[in-house]
Curated annotation (Swiss-Prot):
InterPro entries: Metallo-B-lactamas, RibonucZ/Hydroxyglut_hydro, RNase_Z/BN
Active site: residue positions: D63 (proton acceptor)
Cofactors that this protein relies on: Zn(2+)
Organism: Nanoarchaeum equitans (strain Kin4-M)
Protein name: Ribonuclease Z
EC number annotated for this UniProt entry: 3.1.26.11
Catalysed reaction equations from the record: Endonucleolytic cleavage of RNA, removing extra 3' nucleotides from tRNA precursor, generating 3' termini of tRNAs. A 3'-hydroxy group is left at the tRNA terminus and a 5'-phosphoryl group is left at the trailer molecule
Length: 316
């Protein structure tokens, strides 16, 4: 599950909290950014900060980290029995240590703070990759990738009346096996089941490198900070435009474009945004508390339990 907790940029408004996205994958909780009121947003979705194992911060600006002091304080006051690891760009360690010291937070659980650059971190069934953006302070974009799986083609096996056999495990290792006098070639009797990939890009100027970084994403979460008519302001403040987002999505062969970090300046003129988006396909302007289910290879984007978008990345 992917929970879009906060979708605003710069400051909270009566419509949007600032950015945070929580992912619950195979029992691991991953929080991307911790905008103001992240805890409250989690509780509105019946989630708890105690479910967090990893926090990935894009950068140290307040609208992306002001929820962090409260999270650390809550974990210190609750029965949190996990190890928390916080990742972020250079400078994040000093900031977090000052937060802990300034708020006199008694950290009574294992806490690791890791400053990273462009890297790929393996978490077993998935990995998270990072790449630098261009902003007033060091900023990272992130990509979550569920590892592809080698699956046995049961339909083809059924044609040879082969249903189950311990030797079939060898096929997944790329080895030929002989069953009932029939030699099975792994190239013919196995296939790759694609893993989920999503990419988060926010608070950065456009970079050509983002296209390869986001390659074949099922979802791209991208900031909606400036329209094209305000491109000069976007460059001045080190942000991307709405056209930059579509360029990354289209040229990277990615699917669903979800806009987050929506600027308060456009809240009263959403009609202008929708005019631009009228002839575009596969996009959603996220709202707080939207969530994405991932079941049997199908992505289901929901708002208030209503399905807005459904897309199968593989079929069983």
């Amino acid at each position: 599950m992917i929970y879009i907790l906060g979708t605003g940029g710069n400051m909270p408004t009566k419509y949007r909290q600032t950015l945070s996205i929580f992912v619950n994958y195979m029992g691991k909780g991953i929080l991307f950014d911790a905008g103001e009121n992240t805890q409250r947003q989690m509780r509105l979705l019946n989630l708890s900060p105690t479910q967090i194992d990893y926090i990935f911060l894009t950068h140290i600006h307040g609208d992306h980290i002001l929820g962090l002091p409260g999270i650390l304080l809550s974990l210190s006051n609750q029965d949190y029995n996990r190890e928390l690891t916080i990742f972020g760009p250079k400078g994040i360690k000093e900031v977090i240590e000052k937060i802990i010291d300034s708020f006199a937070i008694n950290i009574n659980f294992p806490l690791k703070i890791k400053e990273i650059g462009e890297t790929k971190i393996d978490f077993g069934p998935f990995y998270i990759e990072s790449i630098y953006g261009i902003h007033q302070v060091p900023v990272l974009a992130y990509s979550f990738k569920e590892k592809d799986k080698i699956k046995i083609n049961k339909e083809k096996l059924a044609k040879y009346n082969i249903r189950s056999n311990p030797k079939l495990a060898k096929l997944k290792e790329g080895k030929s096996v002989t069953i009932n006098g029939i030699t099975l070639d792994p190239k013919e009797f196995t296939y790759i089941q694609k893993g989920l990939k999503f990419t988060l890009i926010t608070d950065t100027l456009f970079r050509e490198q983002f296209i390869d970084f986001a390659r074949d994403s099922d979802i791209i979460f991208h900031e909606l900070a400036f329209l094209d008519k305000d491109k000069d302001k976007a460059i001045e403040h080190y942000h991307s435009t709405i056209s930059d987002a579509f360029r990354i999505r289209d040229e990277s062969n990615s699917k669903l474009l979800v806009f987050i970090h929506v600027s308060p300046r456009y809240q009263g003129s959403l009609f202008e945004i929708y005019q631009y988006l009228y002839n575009k396909k596969d996009w959603i302007i996220a709202e707080d508390l939207d969530y994405i289910e991932y079941k049997k290879g199908t992505i289901i984007y929901k708002r208030n339990d209503i399905v807005l978008y459904e897309y199968a990345i593989w079929r069983s």
